[in-house]
Amino acid sequence: MNPLVTLIIYITLISGTIITMTSSHWLTVWMGLEMNMFAIIPLIMKTHTPRAIEATTKYFLIQASASMLLLMAATINFMEFGQWTVIDMPSPIASTIILAAIMMKLGMAPFHFWVPEVTQGTLLSTSLIILTWQKLAPLSILYQIYPSMNPKIILASAMLSIMIGGWGGLNQTQLRKIMAYSSIAHMGWMSAILIYNPSLMLLNLTLYIIFTITMFTILIHCMATSNKTLSMMWNNTPILMMTLLLTLLSMGGLPPLSGFVPKWLIINEMITNNNITISLTMAMLALLNLYFYMRLIYSSSLTLFPSSNNMKFKWKMNNTPKLPFLPTLTIISILMLPITPMMFIFE
């Protein structure tokens, strides 16, 4: 792709998200979402393969439908109450429609079907953008309007997302689909705590983005797209492989690592608000995610796929690529638990 065209695409992508996050009028919010959608489409179909074209079509149809629902709900709210502001959403019909539109854009259940297919059909770098940057604009809208939303609908979708994010990843061997189902589960955790403590949602979002960037950075540099290719990384880049495995454990919420922090704080907050049954169910469903992370770690580190080369390690290791920001991301992804008591803002 032409470097100038690529620059224009990324500028449009960033501008669309910033416009949506800083707008207080529904029309400018919708305009920012449209800019965001049209900027990501050329990146998804960069490879010009049938799978990429299929992923682009699915992404366009889902996102365009969600934008249409959002604009329709904003129009209904204006016709009933004469309000175009984002925060003021007194119409229950309009608020429910907007919530459905945001769930479609975030890939939350029951509108989650497009996320694994689109993520699998494109490049690793584009999958990273879809699972991180593309979540910011819809989450910023949800953050502003959650007081007007029905909390029962949000909690039901959150529980369903956590369940599907765990069950959907059990049979997967493609790493991009595993990360997609992990994203669905993380969106469920964020939306569940939003109605009780929005600051915890921001903490969870920050850590989720750091985990995902760390994972995809390693996968991109090792060109690993499946469980089989991941098992061959021990021969080439054992240090990066060890970092990847620790990041996977952290994403699963294993206690000594950073990923345990948001789950611990979220469950504590929900128990404080007398939602013991919901928090217990969420904790049990989180074990599904931890299970397929552990299975991925076992199959990639403790087993070897059949190969014509009987050597377990190469006689000469490849140089680890220079990734100046990866050590910082890795430390945050793994070793942030000791500073948790300093996070008094999230209490």
UniProtKB/Swiss-Prot annotation:
Record-level GO BP terms: mitochondrial electron transport, NADH to ubiquinone
EC numbers, comma separated: 7.1.1.2
Ranges that cross the membrane: 1-21, 25-45, 59-79, 96-116, 123-143, 153-173, 178-198, 200-220, 239-259, 278-298, 325-345
UniProt GO molecular function: NADH dehydrogenase (ubiquinone) activity
Keywords carried by this UniProt record: Electron transport, Membrane, Mitochondrion, Mitochondrion inner membrane, NAD, Respiratory chain, Translocase, Transmembrane, Transmembrane helix, Transport, Ubiquinone
Cellular compartments annotated: Mitochondrion inner membrane
Pfam family, one: Proton_antipo_M
Main location class: mitochondrion
Record membrane topology: Multi-pass membrane protein
InterPro entries from the UniProt entry: Complex_I_Subunit_2 (IPR050175), NADH_DH_su2_C (IPR010933), NADH_UbQ_OxRdtase_chain2 (IPR003917), ND/Mrp_TM (IPR001750)
GO cellular component, as recorded: mitochondrial inner membrane
Annotated catalysed reactions: a ubiquinone + NADH + 5 H(+)(in) = a ubiquinol + NAD(+) + 4 H(+)(out)
Description of how the protein assembles with itself and partners: Core subunit of respiratory chain NADH dehydrogenase (Complex I) which is composed of 45 different subunits. Interacts with TMEM242.
Family per similarity comment: Belongs to the complex I subunit 2 family.
Database matches in PANTHER family: NADH-UBIQUINONE OXIDOREDUCTASE CHAIN 2 (PTHR46552:SF1)
Role played: Core subunit of the mitochondrial membrane respiratory chain NADH dehydrogenase (Complex I) that is believed to belong to the minimal assembly required for catalysis. Complex I functions in the transfer of electrons from NADH to the respiratory chain. The immediate electron acceptor for the enzyme is believed to be ubiquinone.
UniProt protein name: NADH-ubiquinone oxidoreductase chain 2
Organism: Oryzorictes hova
